[in-house]
């Protein structure tokens, strides 16, 4: 019998991905300090935080054992780590700084088997090339989508696609914060496969 699956995230976007994959899961929000360590690269940061989120959920879950998914994401432009904008002004500022540039998103993914006390961590990169945007286009985009809770100030699964001239990476779900191809590969090692009959 496979262990129950828990998503260690409050993100509705990550839940939507798991729903599309026909996975049965519970949600437990982790409560961790997400501060970066000064010498940490973006890849190290998201890997560490994804694992920390998965391990934090173990302390809060109601199951004896489970498979816990932790995930974290940052956007990097010109060597600077970008977070969620939080408000309209910051979103406009972020998007304006991306004009004609490539922004790399790093998504850390952790799958933690609490029974075996084993945690596998992967970091998936994804590049977004922004086209030449006008100030009016940026203002209108922010007005229509309110991307204040999204790293990089856009929702690629919606109108955000109109901001780009190109995408480069293994899995477009990585932009939404949960690389599904890597996740399914990791889950299969724990006996979880949505294509198998129960």
Swiss-Prot record:
Family matches, as PANTHER family: 7-METHYL-GTP PYROPHOSPHATASE, BIFUNCTIONAL DTTP/UTP PYROPHOSPHATASE/METHYLTRANSFERASE PROTEIN-RELATED
Cofactor(s) needed for function: a divalent metal cation
UniProt site positions, description: Important for substrate specificity: 13, 73, 157
Places the protein is found: Cytoplasm
Swiss-Prot/TrEMBL keywords: Cytoplasm, Hydrolase, Nucleotide metabolism
Source taxon at top rank: Bacteria
Purpose of the protein: Nucleoside triphosphate pyrophosphatase that hydrolyzes 7-methyl-GTP (m(7)GTP). May have a dual role in cell division arrest and in preventing the incorporation of modified nucleotides into cellular nucleic acids.
SUPFAM superfamilies with a match to the protein in the record: ITPase-like
Enzyme Commission (EC) number: 3.6.1.-
List of catalytic residues: 72
Catalysed reactions, semicolon-separated: N(7)-methyl-GTP + H2O = N(7)-methyl-GMP + diphosphate + H(+)
Pfam family, one: Maf
Main localization of the protein described in the UniProt heading: cytoplasm
Signal peptide: none
Protein name as annotated: 7-methyl-GTP pyrophosphatase
GO MF, one example: nucleoside triphosphate diphosphatase activity
Species annotation: Idiomarina loihiensis (strain ATCC BAA-735 / DSM 15497 / L2-TR)
One of the protein's GO biological processes: nucleotide metabolic process
Family label: Belongs to the Maf family. YceF subfamily.
GO CC term, one of those recorded: cytoplasm
């Amino acid at each position: 019998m496979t262990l129950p699956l828990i998503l260690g995230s409050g993100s509705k976007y990550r839940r939507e991905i798991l729903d599309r994959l026909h996975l049965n899961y519970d949600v437990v929000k982790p409560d961790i300090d997400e501060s970066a360590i000064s010498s940490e690269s973006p890849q190290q940061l998201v890997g560490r935080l994804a694992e920390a989120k998965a391990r934090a959920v173990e302390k809060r879950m109601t199951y004896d054992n489970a498979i816990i998914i932790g995930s974290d994401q940052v956007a990097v432009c010109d060597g600077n780590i970008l977070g969620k904008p939080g408000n309209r002004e910051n979103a406009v500022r972020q998007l304006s700084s991306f004009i004609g540039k490539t922004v790399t998103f790093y998504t850390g993914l952790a799958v933690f088997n609490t029974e075996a006390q084993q945690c596998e961590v992967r970091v998936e990169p994804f590049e977004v090339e922004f086209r030449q945007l006008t100030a009016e286009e940026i203002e209108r985009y922010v007005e229509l989508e309110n991307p204040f809770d999204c790293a990089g100030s856009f929702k690629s699964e919606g109108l955000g696609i109109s901001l780009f001239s190109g995408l480069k990476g293994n899995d477009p779900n990585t932009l939404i914060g949960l690389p599904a191809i890597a996740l399914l590969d990791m889950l299969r090692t724990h006996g979880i496969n949505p294509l198998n009959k129960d």
